[in-house]
């Protein structure tokens, strides 16, 4: 391991001890924001400190085993050889683990997200598939203990959605869903198809980290136009009786957001403003990613919504992620929310991309 990496790890251990002490101070405990931020930092540092301590112990074990090789007792020498082998394996494993842990963190990884699914080419079938994708993500969220709430929805004429926007909140939501942005293509025989022909339809998915106050996304009230309108769709007796739905237009960028799912105009406005901030934050992220891709090609992290990222082929029971050439013949499981078999390879590919970038620098 390079001396520069060891020095960085040593400074992180010192910071871990410092944060641990701060978390027990009365002034920090009484300040919810500071306590929350320091708790997050502590939980991020904890696995790094644990792995480095194990790495240091493995180095000591290796040194002790080397010294035992000089023993005259043949049995002790054999034992030393075995311990040396185990220590070398542990060192190699922990060095790789520490490399991953030291990769630059995406500051939005812990964020909640807005998930936007829109029907693209394919008419009614695209709307139906939007509904299928929403169910898939809802089941995945449930499996991970996340919560999901619908912000606004425009239903398709024969089921599904022309567009549905939801908020997903829980631990590490953005870190797992950020690679889902892009065009999702489906190949199957629609229920309305009498000739049994396979149709190709598409939906676009956008995953945006929820922007809270710490992101520094400030919106000038003079830059927005707010309209009220009557909510439509499912929602019980309350729907259509009041102009509770909100549409906000951000004049400088032309970004438009709507919220009609909450039961009061005040709540809809608050949700719409949060969504607008998140869209503006995502625009900044997209801009940064484009600048990075001008200098290096990232297979996974481009987030381009027009890029076809995945195909769901029903006749073959196949899912293919085109960015990493991953093909799985477990479509039914994936549509039931078993997304880790796709998401984890994407995360690993992204980590490999970051490692390659670090080695180039």
Curated annotation (Swiss-Prot):
Compartment(s) of residence: Cytoplasm
Modified residues (N5-methylglutamine): 237
Keyword presence, Isomerase: no
Post-translational modification: Methylated by PrmC. Methylation increases the termination efficiency of RF1.
Pfam families linked: PCRF (PF03462), RF-1 (PF00472)
Biased composition (Basic and acidic residues): 287-297
UniProt-listed PROSITE patterns: RF_PROK_I (PS00745)
InterPro entries named in the record: PCRF, Pep_chain_release_fac_I, Pep_chain_release_fac_I_sf, Prokaryotic/Mito_RF, RF-1
Annotated segments matching region Disordered: 287-313
UniProt keyword Secreted, yes or no: no
Paired cysteines (S-S): none
UniProt xrefs under SMART domains: PCRF (SM00937)
Gene Ontology terms, MF aspect: translation release factor activity, codon specific
Main subcellular localisation: cytoplasm
Family indicated by similarity: Belongs to the prokaryotic/mitochondrial release factor family.
General function of this protein: Peptide chain release factor 1 directs the termination of translation in response to the peptide chain termination codons UAG and UAA.
Protein name as annotated: Peptide chain release factor 1
Annotated source species: Francisella tularensis subsp. novicida (strain U112)
GN (gene name): prfA
